[in-house]
């Protein structure tokens, strides 16, 4: 086992003895990372970690670092919903790129605790279809589902940014890329990190 990956006891329901499972050192510090495309596996890992850390200590904030091109909508919504319902506040920090579902997870952080690094990029757009060669009936059903998902995502951006519905809808019509300061102006993040010239740290 690599140094810095501690184990914690975990007892499954119905089992008498606990088994020891690995917990990453960064997770013990309540630091979580979304550094890839959002899919079911990544979503389940992050959801499980947030729930576990919330049970472990409901008073300490969580910090979610995001550098993601986006991914699947439903797994992304699972992460977003979990962030809203766990007891600790979830700080979201954009480093690199938060695009598509990555930007929705970014905006889902605790209001006043959403931050972007100065050279980060953010992109929002409407959900895309996976049925490029579907039968007509399947395409219609897919289109109906896409409209529902678009409505859901739009409402989230409206609620979390404070921007009017028409403005968010207009932005989502295309791939809308933003700098860190533009994302702050749009209400997607609350703060942009600035470099401390004396220490070369970001504050």
Swiss-Prot record:
GO terms assigned for molecular function: ATP-dependent peptidase activity; ATPase binding; serine-type endopeptidase activity
Cellular component per GO, a single term: endopeptidase Clp complex
Chief location category: plastid
Gene3D superfamilies assigned to the protein according to its UniProt record, in alphabetical order: 2-enoyl-CoA Hydratase, Chain A, domain 1
Name by which UniProt lists this protein: ATP-dependent Clp protease proteolytic subunit
Quaternary state and interactors: Component of the chloroplastic Clp protease core complex.
Described function: Cleaves peptides in various proteins in a process that requires ATP hydrolysis. Has a chymotrypsin-like activity. Plays a major role in the degradation of misfolded proteins.
Keywords, comma-separated and alphabetical: Chloroplast, Hydrolase, Plastid, Protease, Serine protease
Catalytic activity: Hydrolysis of proteins to small peptides in the presence of ATP and magnesium. alpha-casein is the usual test substrate. In the absence of ATP, only oligopeptides shorter than five residues are hydrolyzed (such as succinyl-Leu-Tyr-|-NHMec, and Leu-Tyr-Leu-|-Tyr-Trp, in which cleavage of the -Tyr-|-Leu- and -Tyr-|-Trp bonds also occurs)
Catalytic EC class: hydrolase
Species lineage: Eukaryota, Viridiplantae, Streptophyta, Embryophyta, Tracheophyta
Any Pfam family matching the protein: CLP_protease
GO biological process: protein quality control for misfolded or incompletely synthesized proteins
UniProt xrefs under CDD domains: S14_ClpP_2
Keyword Endoplasmic reticulum listed: no
Family from the record: Belongs to the peptidase S14 family.
Protein location: Plastid, Chloroplast stroma
E.C. number(s) listed in UniProt: 3.4.21.92
Catalytic residues (positions): 100 (nucleophile), 125
């Amino acid at each position: 086992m690599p140094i810095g990956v501690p184990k914690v006891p975990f007892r499954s329901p119905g089992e008498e003895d606990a088994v020891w499972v690995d917990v990453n050192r960064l997770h013990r510090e309540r630091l979580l990372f979304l550094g890839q495309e959002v899919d079911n596996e990544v979503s389940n890992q992050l959801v499980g970690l947030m729930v576990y850390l919330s049970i472990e200590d409901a008073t300490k904030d969580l910090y979610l670092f995001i550098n993601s091109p986006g991914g699947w909508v439903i797994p992304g919504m699972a992460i977003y919903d979990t962030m809203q319902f766990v007891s600790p506040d979830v700080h979201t920090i954009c480093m690199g790129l938060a695009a598509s579902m990555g930007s929705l997870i970014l905006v889902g952080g605790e209001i006043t605790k959403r931050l972007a690094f100065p050279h980060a990029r953010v992109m929002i757009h409407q959900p895309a279809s996976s049925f490029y060669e579907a039968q007509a009936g399947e395409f219609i059903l897919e289109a109906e589902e896409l409209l529902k998902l678009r409505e859901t995502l739009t409402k989230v951006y409206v609620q979390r940014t404070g921007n009017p519905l028409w403005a968010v809808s207009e932005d989502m019509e295309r791939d809308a890329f933003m700098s860190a300061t533009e994302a702050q102006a749009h209400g997607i993040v609350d703060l942009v990190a600035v470099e401390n010239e004396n220490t070369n740290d970001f504050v």
